[in-house]
Amino acid sequence: MKKKISSRVVLAVVLLATTLALAAPNPPKANAPQNVPSFPGTLVNARYVYVTSYDGDEFNINLLSEDRQAIVTVQDAMQKWGKFTLVYEPGQADIVLMVMSRPSEDVLAVYDAHGWPRNEYLWRMMGHGGLQQGEAPLVTNLEKAFDLATAK
């Protein structure tokens, strides 16, 4: 009788341990930023970047001040990062970064300049407060994604 009970206890413990092991979430990869899409490999050799807004460039008089500030913030971040040379004409660019800043959410998208504006974005992130002056987490995520793409 005692042997029957102890074998049931052992079986129950093994089943419980197996269930817990299978149900446990996988730990995140050490090098992958969470929720950051991978940067397109076709653009890792790009050198020139143009920054604009979905509603027009920074010199458009109808552009919202938030979008104008987002353009300047991204331009400053690109210059500090130093991976790309900033250009002020879309025809000179390899990559076009498009921004939109709204109270509810900011957007940063990467386009191949050779198909822009007809083509779809190749990389995009959105987030509340993602393109604020002085701190641009969306640009930081772009840098991380680019660095991971070039490290391969």
Where are the regions a protein language model picked out?
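Compositionally biased, low-complexity segments enriched in small residues
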Residues: 1, 14-15, 27
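Bacterial N-terminal signal peptides that target proteins for export
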Residues: 2-12
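A short, structured loop/turn motif at beta-sheet edges
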Residues: 45, 88-93, 113-116
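A short, hydrophobic beta-strand-centered structural micro-motif
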Residues: 51-53, 79, 85-109
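Bacterial N-terminal signal peptides
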Residues: 10-21
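A structural "domain/chain start" motif
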Residues: 22-80, 116, 122-130, 145-152
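Amphipathic beta-strand/beta-sheet edge segments enriched in Tyr/Trp
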Residues: 95-152
